[in-house]
């Protein structure tokens, strides 16, 4: 938990989970070599910003302005649950909003802010920070390709234990995911579609929730 990690170092003014973003940003900027990364090249700077954003395990879309340095950082979570749009006016100014209508008439060009991306004013342009090997089918195919008959035979023998392990992994991952979302500082509920998935999520939420889960 980010708040607990920095509790003795930063004085949090609110109970909002959004405030932890400031802690992560300050830690990133406190690195003695961060300013030099801007001049060392895009790869080093990108890696450091990506490292910070990877620590945010949840739903988010934010624009952080650093008044001391006159720079900003905009980012959106990997799934893109919260809407976010970015636009540019004729003078090259960057505008960002959670509703498209806020940018209409203000920009020469606007577009959705891509999920899993960030925009840092010192290195303009949307850049992907969230990357996984399963993004590409070819990469996964190569990773799990059966090389020979012996390996295939071994896998058949181990199929049942592996299946049981996979079921447990899915169970544990689902519970951990739902439990993590229950850390929200605002009221939450479950939208029931009548299917199995929403029912399972509701059951897990009820198991770990300290308050009544609304539907």
Q: How should each PLM-predicted stretch be described?
A:
Residues 1-215:
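Cysteine-centered catalytic environments shared across enzyme families
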């Amino acid at each position: 938990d980010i708040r607990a990690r920095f509790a003795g170092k930063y004085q949090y003014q609110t109970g909002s989970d959004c405030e932890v973003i400031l802690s992560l940003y300050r830690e990133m900027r406190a690195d003695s070599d961060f300013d030099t990364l801007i001049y060392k090249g895009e790869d080093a700077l990108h890696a450091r910003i990506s490292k910070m954003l990877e620590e945010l395990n949840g739903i988010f879309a934010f624009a952080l302005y650093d008044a001391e340095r006159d720079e900003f950082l905009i980012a959106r979570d990997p799934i893109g649950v919260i809407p976010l749009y970015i636009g540019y006016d004729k003078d090259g100014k960057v505008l960002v909003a959670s509703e498209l209508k806020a940018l209409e008439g203000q920009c020469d060009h606007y577009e959705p802010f891509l999920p899993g991306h960030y925009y840092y004013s010192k290195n303009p342009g949307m850049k992907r920070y969230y990357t996984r090997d399963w993004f590409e089918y070819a990469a996964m195919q190569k990773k799990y390709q059966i090389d020979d008959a012996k390996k295939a035979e071994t896998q058949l023998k181990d199929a049942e234990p592996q299946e049981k392990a996979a079921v447990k992994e899915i169970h544990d991952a689902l519970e951990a995911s739902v439990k993590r979302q229950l850390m929200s500082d605002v009221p939450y509920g479950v939208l029931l579609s009548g299917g199995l998935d929403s029912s399972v999520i509701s059951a897990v939420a009820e198991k770990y929730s300290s308050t009544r889960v609304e539907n």
